[in-house]
């Protein structure tokens, strides 16, 4: 199961940490795993491995300000849930569209 790490630019350019897991054969589709409120991407590792074992690619990622998408210090850092939904989620989907243009999302 190939796994790669990525820095996906959000729609405003903020870098988002992501892990892309792909089955050994051709994937049927790709799943964007949007975590629960401030839940780190690693929490969904077992789910992603299950998807890959069933021929789906999976993208795990951290919202801005959380996990590996957090700056070294959160002092003075501003991230709103609105940013997660309007700037972060669509950028990850764009990345998946570019990476897997012919697969369902």
Positions of predicted regions on the chain:
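Conserved beta-strand positions that form and line the central face of beta-propeller blades
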Residues: 7, 33, 83
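Alpha/beta-hydrolase active-site loop
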Residues: 43, 78-99
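Conserved acidic functional residues
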Residues: 36, 62, 88
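Alpha-helix C-cap/termination motif
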Residues: 24-25, 54, 99
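Alpha/beta-hydrolase fold nucleophile elbow
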Residues: 100-105
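Conserved alpha/beta-hydrolase
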Residues: 43-74
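Active-site glycine-rich loops that stabilize anionic/oxyanionic intermediates
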Residues: 25-28, 33-39
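N-terminal cap/lid segment of alpha/beta-hydrolase-fold proteins
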Residues: 1-25
